């Protein structure tokens, strides 16, 4: 009686075992026994191709230079100051502890003096109203905070203890006059701007040198807050602070503009 021609021989040279239920490799289409069915066990030539492809793909992404950060981006995000590459989370100077970060104490001192001069230049009833408004802003913020907590948009994953709430007045000409939002108190001003722009679906060209930049401005003085400062820094200030539950302005300014004009018009 003739032997039935069933099964096939394993294609591994030193094996050649006949298997009645042979395995076909999905990559090289070779036929193998149970022992040699994996790509590694039969030395599949496609393994080398895949490994080379993975190595090539690694070169098309950009690693973050910040210590202990393993994030990679598909496009280069280069800090214009230290000229190193970072992920989106660490792209601002304060977030990656930039070696070129300068503490703008002289400029801030000059700015505070300018704010004081502007206020002092106001006389009579106008100046009186300004000071009265500043005095009552903390109380007003506490009253508004409860309402903001019910309606504000933000990152829902943030712990309640880290949230800070603002009624954000949007740039002139926007579809909405203002929008309630919450942020992490440890975020830099620059990061808060990016987040607010995303929530309000605003054009954000802050990474372009020639375009007008989105800036967060103080509701009382109109001062554009420095991008590298943190929100908690301004909450803790003794002179002209921000208040949790208070108002803040988001507006487009030129690079040379350090103040938002006509802040009263945003509240009308």
UniProtKB/Swiss-Prot annotation:
Zn(2+) 4 binds at residues 79, 82, 96, 98. This is AN1-type zinc finger protein 1. Zn(2+) 3 binds at residues 64, 69, 87, 90. It is found in: Cytoplasm, Stress granule. The keyword Zinc-finger applies. Zn(2+) 2 binds at residues 25, 28, 42, 44. The gene is ZFAND1. The ubiquitin-like region is necessary for its localization to stress granules (SGs) in a VCP-independent manner. The AN1-type 1 and 2 zinc finger domains are necessary for the recruitment of the 26S proteasome to SGs. Both the AN1-type 1 and 2 zinc finger domains and the ubiquitin-like region are necessary for efficient SGs clearance upon specific arsenite-induced responses. Gene3D superfamilies: AN1-like Zinc finger. Zn(2+) 1 binds at residues 10, 15, 33, 36. GO terms for molecular function: proteasome binding; zinc ion binding. GO terms for cellular component: cytoplasm; cytoplasmic stress granule. Associates with the 26S proteasome; this association occurs upon exposure to arsenite and is reduced in the presence of ATP. Interacts (via AN1-type 1 and 2 zinc fingers) with PSMD1; this interaction is increased upon arsenite treatment and occurs in an ATP-independent manner. Interacts with PSMC4. Interacts with PSMA1. Interacts (via its ubiquitin-like region) with VCP; this interaction occurs in an arsenite-dependent manner and is necessary for the recruitment of the ubiquitin-selective ATPase VCP to stress granules (SGs). The keyword Flavoprotein does not apply. Plays a role in the regulation of cytoplasmic stress granules (SGs) turnover. SGs are dynamic and transient cytoplasmic ribonucleoprotein assemblies important for cellular protein homeostasis when protein production is suspended after acute exogenous stress. Associates with SGs and is involved in the efficient and specific arsenite-induced clearance process of SGs through the recruitment of the ubiquitin-selective ATPase VCP and the 26S proteasome. One of its GO terms (biological process) is positive regulation of intracellular protein transport. It holds the Pfam family zf-AN1. Keywords: Acetylation, Cytoplasm, Metal-binding, Repeat, Zinc, Zinc-finger.
């Amino acid at each position: 009686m003739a032997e039935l021609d069933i099964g096939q021989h394993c294609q591994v040279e030193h094996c050649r075992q006949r298997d009645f239920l042979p395995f076909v490799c999905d990559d090289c289409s070779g036929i193998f026994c149970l022992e040699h069915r994996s790509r590694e066990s039969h030395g599949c030539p496609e393994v080398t191709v895949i490994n080379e492809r993975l190595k090539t793909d690694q070169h098309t992404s950009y690693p973050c230079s910040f210590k202990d950060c393993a994030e990679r981006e598909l496009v280069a995000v280069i800090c214009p100051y230290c000229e190193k590459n970072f992920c989106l989370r660490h792209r601002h100077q304060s977030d990656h502890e930039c070696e070129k970060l300068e503490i703008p104490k002289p400029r801030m001192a000059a700015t505070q003096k300018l704010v004081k001069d502007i206020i002092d230049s106001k006389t009579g009833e106008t100046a009186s109203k300004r000071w009265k408004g500043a005095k009552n802003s903390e109380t007003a913020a506490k009253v508004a905070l409860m309402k903001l907590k019910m309606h504000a948009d933000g990152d829902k994953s943030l712990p309640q203890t880290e949230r800070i709430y603002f009624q954000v007045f949007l740039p002139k000409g926007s579809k909405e006059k203002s929008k309630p939002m919450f942020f992490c108190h440890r975020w830099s001003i620059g990061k808060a701007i990016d987040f607010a722009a995303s929530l309000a679906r605003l054009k954000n060209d802050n990474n372009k040198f020639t375009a007008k930049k989105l800036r967060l401005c103080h509701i009382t003085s109109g001062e554009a807050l420095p991008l590298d400062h943190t929100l908690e820094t301004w909450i803790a200030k003794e002179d002209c602070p921000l208040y949790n539950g208070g108002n803040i302005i988001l507006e487009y300014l030129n690079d040379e503009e350090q103040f938002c004009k006509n802040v009263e018009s945003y509240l009308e």
